[in-house]
Structures are given as C-alpha cells and as structure tokens.
C-alpha cells in the first residue's frame, strides 16, 4: 500500500503510518520491510538487503530485532492524538509462519488495544504472474516456469492465512477478494483508507507498482543475466527505464505450467473455503474461473519474443553505459 507518501494527511485524521522499519541501507521503502525479519529467527533474507540489515548470524538477528522494536517504540511515544497505526508489508502474507504470527501478536498486543488484519486476496494464478514481475524487477533471473516451480508454496493460501487467524482470531482477520471492480475507486489504497474512515486518499495517486509486460519481463530478465555474468550489481536506473517503457499485463501461465499447479490450487482453495470462506468479502474466485481462461491466453511467449527481449536488453545496457561515459567527460 502506498500510504507512505501521505503521512501528513493520515496523521491529521489520527492515523499513523510509521517510518520505523521502512529504511534499509540508503533506501526508504513504502512498506515496513524490516518488520518480518525482526519478528523471526528463521526464514529467508534476500542477499540484496542482507548486508544492509547487518544480519550474519542468530546474534545479529536478535540485535536487529531489538533495534527495530526500539525504533517503533520511540516513534509511538511521539504520537499525539493517534487512534490507529498501520503496518503494511505483503511479505507478512507471502512468508507467513506460526513463528511470525506468534511474535507479531506478542509485539502488537503489548502496545495496542485492538489489532485488525486486512488481506486483499488475489486469484492464485494472477498472484503468481504479478509476483513474477516483481521478482524480475528485484533482479531475478528465472524463467516464469522456473519461478513457479520454486515458489509453488505461494499459492497455498490456507498456509499463508491460517497462522494469522489462529493467533488473532477469525473476527480480527478481514479477507477481501481482490477485484478492482469492487474496490473504492478501483484502487486498493483508496479502499483500505475508506475502511479507516478516510475518503479521497490514494485514488488520485498514480500507482507506481505497475507490472512489467511480457516483453518487459524478457528485457529486464536479460539485463539481470548480463550483470550477473559480469558479477556486478544492476543499476537501479535500468529497472526504472524498463518499467516505464514496458509496463502492462505480466506473462500469463501457459497451459503446461497451469496444469502442473492446478491440483495445488484446488487443495488450498478448498481448505481456505472450509475454514474462513464465510468471512471473505466480495465475490471470491472459483476454480472454474481459472479453468475457463481461453487457451490463447495461456500460450507460451514464443522464441521470437524471447530473442527480441535479448536484443532490446543489450541495446538498453549499451545506451545506458554510453550515456554514463559521455557524462563523465
């Protein structure tokens, strides 16, 4: 949620969106990225931010936890007239575990009178497609099929949601079917803000987190591969260039990939409906929704498009490096 740029508006309404947990190294993120790492002693940490967090072992992980909690407490102590505090990070869903939910509950219940968890739940196949685009933006190099195979646990929604339900109770967990047609102004931020009693927040703000198009994923993936072979870090500017030039619908799962995961989707879907189905807001997706997708939309991208992505990637990198050399004179 992109509420970080609207802190003053929120604060005037008695809502805090803390800065604690958003800064990693020299970058400030729109989400509370560090919170998950502070609440757990296990779980993956991307190598791209590992050094910035200063976590190398269990001892430094515990130190990071204490540091982050101190940051939150110091910021909370400064609030005046605040009745609601918002924490936001999709990784709290993606990497949900009993350990994370238990530690989060201990942290929150010691500081707040009431905790409400809001989850906007996207259809599993669309979630994988969207997350693949984010994977490539973050420097990933996998093909779509390889990414799906490695991240199949992402679509086990029951495993992602039930730890929170078990710790906070079903009445505190609000699951909303992600369909822009049913959101306030078709916007997630505006919809969430309205649930906090705010109108007009987010709807006019252009969403910066647009997905890469099919060609965009090919282009940026090849740029990532080029810098990997050079054993150097991809310049952030290249991500911005490709994101601006090649935004759009991300690659769809082709028929072969979809067939390999439909059983996993069905099992988790049935478990989710059996446990919290009655509390889901909005028209929820069904298995038939995914099975009815036209075959034409599930076709592989093709070798020609992949080759075009490689050609454009080389051109983008060459142009970028040429401009840097020219500016140095």
Task: Walk through the language-model features, giving the residues of each.
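Anion-recognition interface
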Residues: 1-329
């Amino acid at each position: 949620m992109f509420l970080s740029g609207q802190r003053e508006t929120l604060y005037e309404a008695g809502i805090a969106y803390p800065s604690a947990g958003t800064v990693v190294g020299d970058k400030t993120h729109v989400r509370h990225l560090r919170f998950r790492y502070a609440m757990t002693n296990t779980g993956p940490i991307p190598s791209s931010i590992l050094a910035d967090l200063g976590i190398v072992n269990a001892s430094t992980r515990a130190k990071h936890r204490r540091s982050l909690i101190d940051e939150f407490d110091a910021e909370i102590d400064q609030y005046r007239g605040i009745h609601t505090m918002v924490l936001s990070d999709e990784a709290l869903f993606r990497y949900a575990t009993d350990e994370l939910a238990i530690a989060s509950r201990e942290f929150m219940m010691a500081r707040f009178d009431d905790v409400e968890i809001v989850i906007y739940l996207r259809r599993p196949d669309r979630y994988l497609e969207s997350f693949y685009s984010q994977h490539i933006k973050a420097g990933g190099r996998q093909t779509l099929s390889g990414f799906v195979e490695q991240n199949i646990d992402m679509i086990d929604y029951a495993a992602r949601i039930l730890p929170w339900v078990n710790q906070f109770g079903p009445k505190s967990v609000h699951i909303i079917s992600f369909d822009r047609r049913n959101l306030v102004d078709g916007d997630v931020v505006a919809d969430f803000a309205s649930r906090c009693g705010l109108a007009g927040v987010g709807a006019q703000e252009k969403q910066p987190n647009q997905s890469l198009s099919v060609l965009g994923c090919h282009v940026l993936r090849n740029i990532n591969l080029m810098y990997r072979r050079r054993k150097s870090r991809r310049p952030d500017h290249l991500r911005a260039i490709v994101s601006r030039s090649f935004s759009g619908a991300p690659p769809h799962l082709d028929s072969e990939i979809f067939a390999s995961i439909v059983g996993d989707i069905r099992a988790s879907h049935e478990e989710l409906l059996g446990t919290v189905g009655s509390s889901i807001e909005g028209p929820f997706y069904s298995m038939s929704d995914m099975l009815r997708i036209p075959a034409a939309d599930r076709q592989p991208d093709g070798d020609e498009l992949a080759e075009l992505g490689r050609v454009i990637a080389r051109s983008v990198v060459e142009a970028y490096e040429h401009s840097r050399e020219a500016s140095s004179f």
